[in-house]
């Protein structure tokens, strides 16, 4: 407990077979990267990293030792992944350097490295006329020159008149055009029947109305006659009853 305030630096080396294999892979990767960097002209050389663990307390528990070993294993795995990336990196870096050199030779001093290739653009498609842009800004469509013409310019003054007779300018050698068939002439009887048929068709409804009215009037007259007969019978019956009552009263008075 006396050495609690002291700080001790310890270098922990792998003791298991897996850790030794990882170290061998790291050494082989470092040699490959040095060879590739020397061939491509790059001065970047990976340096093996040592893991230094600083412990403030001299007495460490077993859990802390296990945690430190896990940290070392993750460090070795990270080194392996970095070595595998560095082996594939030189080819891509070389191609990017070639592209940058090509851009500098062409004299492009812009910051962006994007250069579209094999693209043919028509300069006329990049801008519009002032009238079209003005119409689009107002939400309108540019009119055609034909639409802007006046009514008299577009149509002749006599376009509504019927077609002229071409008989005056007809060439005598040309055959005349066929006319439509002429309707047959009707005789007097046919004409009279047609007229009557037309009259009947036109006067059919009023005739039917008059016939209906006549039937209705006849029915009303029959009803009136029946009602009159019934009334007469009732009056006769009442008169007979009165006579019978009067005669019976007189007969009774005479006997008494």
Curated annotation (Swiss-Prot):
Q: How is it modified after translation?
A: Phosphorylation on Tyr-114 acts as a docking site for the recruitment of STATs 1 and 3.
Question: Biotechnological relevance: how is it used?
Answer: Used in cell biology research to transform T-cell lymphocytes. Saimiriine herpesvirus 2 transforms T-cell lymphocytes, including human, to continuous growth in vitro. 2 viral proteins, Tip and StpC, are essential for this function.
PTM Phosphotyrosine: list the residues: 114, 127
Write out the ranges of the annotated region (CSKH/LBD2): 146-155
Which GO CC annotations does the UniProt entry carry? host cell plasma membrane; membrane
* Phenotype upon changing residue 152 to M: Partial decrease of LCK binding
Positions with biased composition (Low complexity) = 27-42
Q: How does it sit in the membrane?
A: Single-pass membrane protein
Q: Where is this region: Disordered?
A: 1-49, 162-183
The record lists the effect of residue 150 to R as: Partial decrease of LCK binding
- Pro residues: bias regions: 174-183
- Sequence intervals crossing the membrane: 229-249
Q: Which UniProt keywords apply?
A: Host cell membrane, Host membrane, Host-virus interaction, Membrane, Oncogene, Phosphoprotein, SH3-binding, Transmembrane, Transmembrane helix
| Entry keyword annotation includes Chaperone | no
What this protein is reported to do is described as:
Plays a critical role in virus induced T-cell transformation. Binds to T-cell-specific tyrosine kinase LCK SH2 and SH3 domains, thereby activating its kinase activity. Once phosphorylated by host LCK, forms a complex with at least STAT 1 and 3, resulting on the phosphorylation of STAT3 and presumably STAT1, and their migration into the nucleus to induce transcription of target genes. Stimulates host ILF3/NF-AT-90 activity. Association with host NXF1/TAP transduces the signal up-regulating surface expression of adhesion molecules as well as activating NF-kappa-B activity.
Name it: Tyrosine-protein kinase-interacting protein
What lineage is on file? Viruses, Duplodnaviria, Heunggongvirae, Peploviricota, Herviviricetes
